């Protein structure tokens, strides 16, 4: 078990490393190499952004996870936008059951600034959920 931040998209960079293949450098990649984590070391990711389609739903930074919006599942009622984001310390509350937003406004402020910086620099890609490839 590891508390390091990782994602299934990291399999891409990890597989390249295992195979001895260089990653493409003609585009920005979100994948990171997990080999340091898999061999008992620290990971390279400190922050992770949770999207649903084009919507930034949440951000994780270190032990903290903050939800701007929540939604149960695709096809369910529209997401709930939280005027004050929900905040959880995943080190002590991995089930995200104790909202700490009122106790830690400084963390809300810090993560909001990180999310804004990310949003200002991110270039949206076409949605794979809204685009269908027609069979020939």
Q: Can you annotate each of these PLM segments?
A:
Residues 39, 133-136:
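Basic/polar N-terminal segments that are highly enriched at the extreme N-terminus
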Residues 93:
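Intrinsically disordered, low-complexity polar regions and short flexible loop motifs
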Residues 44, 108-109:
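Cytochrome P450 catalytic domain signature, combining two hallmark sequence patches
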Residues 1-86, 90, 121, 125:
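C-terminal cap/loop subdomain of S1 sulfatases and analogous C-terminal strand-loop tails that border
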Residues 14, 96-99:
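A general alpha-helix detector
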Residues 104, 111-115:
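Short amphipathic alpha-helical coiled-coil/interface segments
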Residues 123-134:
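Short, flexible loop/turn segments with low-complexity composition
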Residues 98-106:
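Active-site-proximal N-terminal segment of extracellular/periplasmic enzymes that hydrolyze or transfer
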């Amino acid at each position: 078990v590891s508390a390091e931040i990782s994602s299934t998209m990291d399999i891409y960079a990890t597989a390249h490393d295992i195979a001895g293949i260089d990653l493409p450098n003609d585009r920005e990649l979100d994948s990171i190499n997990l080999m340091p984590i898999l061999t008992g070391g620290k990971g390279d990711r400190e922050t992770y952004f949770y999207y649903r389609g084009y919507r930034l739903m949440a951000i994780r930074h270190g032990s903290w996870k903050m939800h701007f919006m929540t939604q149960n599942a695709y096809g369910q009622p529209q997401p709930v936008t939280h005027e004050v984001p929900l905040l959880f310390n995943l080190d002590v509350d991995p089930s995200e059951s104790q909202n700490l937003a009122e106790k830690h406004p400084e963390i809300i402020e810090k993560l909001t600034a990180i999310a804004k910086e990310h949003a200002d620099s991110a270039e949206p890609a076409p949605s794979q959920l809204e685009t269908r490839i027609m069979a020939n």
